[in-house]
């Protein structure tokens, strides 16, 4: 892994060597840049220079934290049709195979999805559906504490999904992709100028496949519509509609196995990653519907107020089951022998086609409604002899979530047991009637929150800026838990809990920008997240204060003299210093845990020559440790610690090395070739002493343009060595990464 990181660093130093000497003019470049109708989109380059992840439109060089941008061009080059796959193209991202079947995203080893750190156009995006890239212009990954901008959140950072917006041009594109596993994907992107300052944009998608390369079928469709009026004028309005339907299969996971009899280590099963052992009746349905609007009022070229409102409806209906090696055991309560036909242990020495597997029952059925409002002001002015870039804003939100459970036969429902299967008979077509389940409300959660923030970037000297920001958040949550008697259909009893949290989130930093090509920063920020985000409220945690975290970073953003190549470097330390633990003596949650990570990151993105383009992202995380967890109980039996982590361990899902490299070369005006690597070092799921092996996968791309660039044919070969690796980890199982896939895309522009 280290040579790849060294290659990125060497490329960046080469670009730095091209940096021109400082100009005589001392004025720094404008921080807030207004969008122009002809501004390039993410599909035009791998390199991005601006972002709105800092609320106002800003140059990346003026944000005192690390930001990685995955543009639409990179998404298209590598045929990344899900947000999860796109995020794998940034260093430090890993995935937990969560109990609910969703992708629990980790950044620098800290959870993002569980703490609500995914956003669409700067507004929070609930974590109960599987996201697609068909309407994305780019993904922005802010690394480190993000609470100053977004409120409650994690230590690792935040991910902002930037939607495609209408432009003042008539331009359309239709793509058709065919691949192995009967993969078919069609997308359309239609931009229509409807007036001097108005435009309409429509995006649509449909995707089907028998297998996504890692055991799950695909059947999804989506549509998005955006209309803008007053583009570039004093008052600009936009209306957005978005809908996505997923009717996919689900590979809930495959168990690990001991390499030898009696070994405490675990390895991956030697199986084709596309192998499926779940029931044919398992499925993973989810949907998202968003309706929103925005108004931007420009007081001047350097001052604007942007107000957004959005309502959303989300649903998830997942019927699946964990696959386990069938093992003989004893029921601790009754003494009865379970699975008497199966061995008491498994290893690769005894593994074969007749090894028996059990299928579990895991339901995740929920719906969620959201309403959000936010208003953000950004402006430039001079005061006290200094230039200021000022940001301020307020936001309000309401979330309502209902989670359902199935009644057992003793409660007036049905008991469904899935048949076992054998290693040698995957895809056996086993079926159970999921429609016969009788559902009831299990819990309901309603939350209202509001926040306000201010930030000022003051230029205290020609090359120096200081950044100071502060945010206040108030969150109120009401949680109702419903239960039935163990052996009766009623009555339904309820317990109610209430949470109220008020927190301040500060951020401070210093920027040193001696030339337009160089920007160095030092920053410190604090974040928090509540019990209502990461856990369901209940008697054990209703009175638990928020977790708090701190991030310290020293970094640089460097551009080549021709501004075609950019490098980002950073060293950082992130600490969660009061992490939740379950008290070993009482059924309550306490803030007794602590963990920290420290490392180095480098991104190198842009054009090395007019024909050679590169995107690289690498993280080295040599320091990662669980410092403190729950104390031992009075019984003397020591707990396993915070969220299952054990003191002294390296936290789960924190590989020492991770990253990606992608490069393309324009050999002729019509022919472009590309190649890339994705890699992750060895890592562990929670509560285990063994590690999952590291992996490197390689991808190839070839693109040929016909008919004056109107028609393009592109072929992608991913995981060319058909590498077996664990993509998402859990203590009892893993979800394999996709095996070798071949996809061919025809694109027509008109």
Regions found by a protein language model. Give the residues of each.
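Membrane-embedded beta-barrel scaffold of Gram-negative outer-membrane proteins
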Residues: 296-298, 304-310, 314-322, 513, ...
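Acidic, small-polar-rich N-terminal luminal/periplasmic segments of exported/outer-membrane proteins
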Residues: 28-169, 554, 731
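Structural signature of Gram-negative outer-membrane beta-barrels, strongest in the C-terminal barrel
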Residues: 228, 368, 387-391, 395-399, ...
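Conserved C-terminal beta-signal and adjacent last beta-strands/turns
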Residues: 366, 390, 552, 649-750
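Acidic/polar loop-and-plug regions of large Gram-negative outer-membrane beta-barrel proteins
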Residues: 207-211, 224-230, 234-298, 313-368, ...
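Outer-membrane beta-barrel translocator/receptor signature
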Residues: 134-137, 148-225, 229-236, 289, ...
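Gram-negative outer-membrane beta-barrel transporters
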Residues: 573-575, 591-687, 721-724, 745-749
């Amino acid at each position: 892994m280290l040579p790849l990181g060294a290659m990125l660093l060497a490329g960046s130093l080469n670009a730095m060597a091209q940096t021109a000497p400082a100009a005589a003019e001392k004025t720094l470049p404008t921080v807030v840049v207004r969008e122009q109708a002809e501004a390039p989109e993410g599909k035009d380059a791998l390199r991005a220079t601006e972002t709105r992840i800092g609320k106002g439109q800003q140059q990346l060089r003026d944000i005192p934290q690390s930001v990685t941008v995955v543009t639409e061009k990179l998404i298209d080059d590598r045929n990344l049709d899900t947000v999860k796959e796109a995020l794998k193209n940034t260093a430090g991202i890993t995935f937990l195979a969560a109990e609910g079947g969703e992708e629990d995203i980790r950044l620098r080893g800290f959870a993002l999805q569980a703490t609500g750190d995914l956003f669409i156009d700067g507004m929070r995006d609930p974590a109960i559906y599987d996201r697609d890239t068909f309407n994305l212009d780019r993904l922005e990954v802010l690394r480190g504490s993000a609470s100053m901008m977004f409120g409650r959140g994690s230590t690792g950072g935040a991910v902002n999904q930037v939607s495609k917006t209408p432009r003042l041009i008539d331009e359309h594109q239709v793509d058709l992709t065919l691949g192995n596993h009967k993969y078919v994907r069609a997308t359309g992107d239609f931009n229509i100028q409807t007036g001097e300052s108005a435009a309409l944009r429509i995006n649509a998608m449909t995707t089907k496949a028998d297998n996504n390369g890692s055991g799950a079928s695909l059947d999804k469709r989506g549509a998005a519509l955006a209309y803008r009026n007053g583009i570039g004028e004093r008052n600009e309005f936009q209306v957005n509609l978005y809908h996505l339907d997923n009717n996919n299969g689900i590979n809930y996971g495959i168990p690990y196995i001991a390499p030898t009899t009696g070994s405490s280590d675990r390895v991956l099963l030697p199986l084709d990653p596309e192998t499926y052992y779940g029931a044919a009746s398992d499925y993973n349905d989810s949907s998202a519907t968003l309706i929103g609007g925005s108004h931007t009022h420009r007081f001047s070229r350097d001052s604007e107020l942007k107000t957004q409102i959005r309502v959303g409806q989300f649903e998830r209906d997942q019927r699946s089951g964990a696959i386990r090696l069938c093992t003989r055991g004893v029921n601790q309560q009754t003494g009865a022998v379970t699975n008497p036909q199966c061995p008491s242990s498994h290893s690769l020495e005894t593994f074969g086609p007749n090894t028996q597997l059990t299928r579990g029952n895991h339901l995740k059925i929920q719906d969620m409604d959201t309403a959000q409002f936010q208003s953000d002001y950004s402006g430039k002015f001079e005061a006290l002899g200094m230039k200021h870039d000022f940001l301020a804003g307020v936001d309000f939100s309401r979330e309502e979530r209902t989670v359902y459970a199935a009644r057992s036969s003793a409660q007036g429902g049905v008991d469904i047991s899935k048949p076992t299967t054998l290693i040698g008979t995957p895809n056996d077509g086993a079926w159970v009637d999921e429609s016969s389940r009788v559902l009831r409300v299990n819990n309901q959660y309603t939350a209202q929150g509001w926040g306000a923030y201010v930030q000022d970037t003051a230029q205290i000297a020609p090359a120096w800026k200081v950044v100071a920001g502060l945010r206040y958040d108030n969150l109120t949550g009401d949680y109702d838990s419903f239960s039935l008697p163990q052996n009766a259909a009623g009555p339904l009893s309820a317990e109610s809990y209430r949470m109220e949290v008020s927190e301040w989130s500060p951020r401070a930093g210093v920027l040193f920008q001696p030339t337009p090509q160089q920007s160095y920063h030092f920053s410190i920020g604090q974040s928090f997240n509540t019990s209502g985000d990461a856990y369901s409220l209940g008697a054990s945690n209703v009175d638990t204060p928020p977790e708090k975290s701190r991030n310290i970073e020293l970094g640089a953003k460097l551009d080549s003299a021709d501004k075609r190549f950019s490098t980002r470097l950073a060293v950082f330390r992130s600490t969660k210093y009061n992490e939740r633990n379950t008290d070993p003596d009482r059924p309550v949650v306490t803030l007794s845990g602590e963990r920290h990570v420290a490392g180095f990151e480098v991104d190198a993105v842009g054009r090395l020559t007019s024909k050679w383009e590169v995107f690289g992202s690498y993280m080295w995380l040599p320091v990662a440790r669980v410092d403190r967890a729950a104390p031992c109980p009075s019984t003397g039996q020591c707990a396993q610690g915070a969220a299952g982590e054990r003191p002294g361990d390296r936290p789960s899902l924190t590989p020492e090395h991770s990253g990606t490299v992608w490069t393309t070369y324009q050999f002729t005006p019509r022919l472009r070739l590309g190649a890339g690597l994705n890699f992750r070092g060895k890592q562990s799921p929670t509560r285990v002493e063994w590690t999952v092996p590291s992996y490197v996968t390689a991808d190839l791309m070839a693109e040929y343009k016909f008919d004056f660039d109107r028609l393009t044919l592109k072929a992608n070969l991913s995981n060319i060595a058909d590498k077996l690796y664990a993509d998402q980890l859990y203590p009892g199982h893993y979800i394999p990464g996709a095996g070798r896939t071949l996809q061919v895309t025809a694109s027509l522009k008109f």
